[in-house]
């Protein structure tokens, strides 16, 4: 069981599996740990993305982010904002085993642990930028190891059925290497990295 392996080897787990109910997800993990007879994990839960807990429908509709959208004839069933990396770093600083978040900017799942591990501050813009790029490369899993790049007959990628998920090996100077588990399918190359780097990158 992966959970037991991580707990026994002090491998932190950070995930946005909380979706609309991070607290519920944490409770479910506790249930799983009991069934698997692992030690009880210490879980940090990041909340705050659900605007309905803090704002009325009118306040949400009047906010600048809603400009140009007409929801006047509809009830708001959900309104969430993206949280950033700092809450993840703060949770890790409390010596938790697992951090569960809800709606979070994708790159924060990598940047948060890096902020915690290296003690980066807001002034460390180059390092934060490097961590953000690392998170962007990892955010879609196997896209960076060839799944996004693959175009059979034009851009062939070996053994996609057994594609390896990416691993980032990060250094304290902000440099990092993207690789994948040995013996897995897929491809890590300048081309696969470049395609994922440009993914969802728009004209600023």
Language-model segments: residues:
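Metallocofactor- and cofactor-centric catalytic cores in central/energy metabolism, strongly enriched
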Residues: 1-60, 72-82, 87, 93, ...
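Glycine-rich beta-alpha junction loops
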Residues: 21, 47-50, 100, 105-106, ...
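Short acidic, glycine/serine/threonine-rich loops at helix termini
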Residues: 24-30, 34, 53-65, 109-116, ...
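Catalytic or ion-translocation cores adjacent to nucleophile or general acid/base/metal-coordination motifs
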Residues: 34-51, 111-152, 156-157
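Catalytic alpha/beta core domains of metabolic enzymes, predominantly
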Residues: 68-85, 89-93, 99-101, 105-135, ...
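A conserved active-site cap/scaffold subdomain adjacent to cofactor or substrate pockets
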Residues: 126-204
């Amino acid at each position: 069981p992966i959970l037991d392996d991580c707990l026994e080897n002090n491998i932190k787990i950070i995930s946005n599996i909380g979706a609309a109910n991070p607290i519920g997800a944490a409770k479910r993990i506790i249930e799983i740990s009991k069934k698997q007879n692992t030690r009880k994990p210490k879980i940090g839960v990041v909340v705050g993305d659900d605007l309905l807990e803090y704002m009325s429908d009118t306040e949400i509709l009047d906010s600048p982010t809603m400009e140009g959208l007409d929801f006047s004839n509809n009830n708001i069933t959900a309104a969430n904002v993206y949280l950033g990396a700092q809450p993840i770093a703060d949770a890790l600083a409390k010596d938790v085993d697992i951090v569960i978040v809800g709606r979070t900017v994708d790159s924060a799942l990598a940047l948060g642990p890096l902020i915690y591990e290296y003690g980066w501050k807001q002034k460390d813009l180059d390092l934060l930028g490097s961590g953000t790029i690392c998170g962007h490369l990892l955010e879609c899993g196997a896209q960076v190891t060839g799944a996004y790049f693959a175009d059979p007959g034009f851009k062939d990628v070996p053994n996609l059925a057994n594609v390896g998920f990416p691993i980032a090996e990060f250094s304290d100077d902000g440099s990092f290497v993207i690789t994948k588990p040995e013996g897995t399918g897929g491809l890590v190359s300048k081309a696969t990295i470049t395609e994922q780097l440009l993914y969802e990158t728009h004209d600023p």
